[in-house]
């Protein structure tokens, strides 16, 4: 475990040297982030976890000079024994050809039939490793090894909102229309980010996610419901 300054109002706790097991490191980061969030350390204003690290943001005017020592001592005492409650979220996804812009490419890369690709993608349980890139974008760990294909050589300038995509060992969902280089294999009618909501992002780090295949008709119906 190493600490690195992140400007003058944050620090990063890096766990990469603790284990070669990425799943264990992710569990460690999520556990420590959850513990720090609940610790109410004076001056700490936000905690953000990633695959192998945790960023702690603080108010320099309110926190004591020995912030690193306090956080180091807390993390050492909390360790991986501290667990975070995991929500389980189901994401409806339509794999219709109009939405699955890169399904043919994934089929060629994996030598799998379309139905097998969809079955593998929708039968796996994913963990939200972190939120980033754009507000509400979930980086999902747990993609089947059989579906691990490289990013597009030339990213799109516009990926439709709700696009369900995969790249290398990760899956993800684009909350907004935005540039992107992942392989789009479907689309969800859910809104992943609402700036007006009390909790703007639908998904949070540590959540468990499963995709449920839906028809085009159900997709359109859900979109209409969301627009009311």
Tell me the role of every PLM-derived stretch.
Residues 1-228:
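Glycine-rich active-site loops that engage anionic ligands at enzyme catalytic sites
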């Amino acid at each position: 475990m190493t600490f690195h300054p992140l400007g003058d109002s944050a620090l990063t706790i890096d766990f990469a040297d603790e284990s070669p097991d990425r799943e264990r490191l992710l569990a460690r980061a999520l556990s420590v982030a959850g513990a720090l969030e609940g610790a109410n350390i004076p001056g700490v204003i936000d905690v953000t976890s990633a695959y192998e690290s945790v960023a702690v943001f603080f108010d320099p005017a309110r926190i004591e000079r020995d912030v690193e020592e306090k956080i180091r001592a807390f993390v050492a005492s909390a360790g991986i024994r501290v667990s975070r409650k995991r929500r389980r979220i189901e994401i409806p996804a339509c794999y219709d050809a109009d939405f699955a812009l890169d399904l043919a490419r994934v089929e060629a890369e994996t030598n799998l039939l379309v139905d097998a690709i969809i079955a593998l993608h929708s039968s796996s349980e994913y963990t939200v490793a972190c939120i980033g890139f754009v507000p509400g974008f979930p980086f999902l760990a747990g993609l089947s090894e059989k579906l691990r294909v490289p990013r597009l050589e030339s990213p799109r300038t516009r990926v439709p909102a709700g696009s369900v995509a995969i790249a290398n060992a990760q899956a993800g969902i684009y909350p907004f229309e935005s540039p992107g280089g992942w392989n789009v294999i479907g689309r969800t009618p859910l809104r992943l980010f609402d700036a007006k909501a009390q909790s703007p992002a639908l998904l949070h780090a540590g959540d468990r996610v499963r995709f449920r295949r839906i028809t085009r008709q159900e997709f359109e119906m859900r979109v209409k419901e969301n627009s009311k």
